[in-house]
């Protein structure tokens, strides 16, 4: 565990979009049995073990996610992991917020969106993301976090 002052640590922001607060109970055949709290606790602990702060935030409201992305410009965030959930296919505003802050990010989806309904095949974020992880369940967040840690600790 790092002994750095948390305000001096590099920061990763993990954003969760709409309905992800229901993880563990909502359509487990698509999204798995892990709760959002369990996922967040695992990510925060893993980041801390590498001397990196990890903030997590979930909202069902698009504007709250946008405001949190805007805050990342000035709060020391160096990397974003985002699961935009249903906003993946609809939100130009979230895309514009990510483009405006100009921070590297990985897009995560619990399910394989390409094995689901055709409307889920389009993402407004993928072309801006440094990477996209889908279909690996909650472990997709772990892989995204490892990439973020590698990126932040290499610089």
UniProtKB/Swiss-Prot annotation:
The active site is at residues 31, 109. Pfam families: DHquinase_II. One of its GO terms (biological process) is chorismate biosynthetic process. The record marks 26 as: Transition state stabilizer. GO terms for molecular function: 3-dehydroquinate dehydratase activity. InterPro entries: DHquinase_II, DHquinase_II_CS, DHquinase_II_sf. Keywords: Amino-acid biosynthesis, Aromatic amino acid biosynthesis, Lyase. It catalyses: 3-dehydroquinate = 3-dehydroshikimate + H2O. Pathway: Metabolic intermediate biosynthesis; chorismate biosynthesis; chorismate from D-erythrose 4-phosphate and phosphoenolpyruvate: step 3/7. PROSITE patterns: DEHYDROQUINASE_II (PS01029). The keyword Transport does not apply. Its EC number is 4.2.1.10. SUPFAM superfamilies: Type II 3-dehydroquinate dehydratase (SSF52304). The keyword Manganese does not apply. Belongs to the type-II 3-dehydroquinase family. Catalyzes a trans-dehydration via an enolate intermediate. Homododecamer. NCBIfam families: aroQ, PRK05395.1-1, PRK05395.1-2, PRK05395.1-3, PRK05395.1-4. This is 3-dehydroquinate dehydratase. It comes from Laribacter hongkongensis (strain HLHK9).
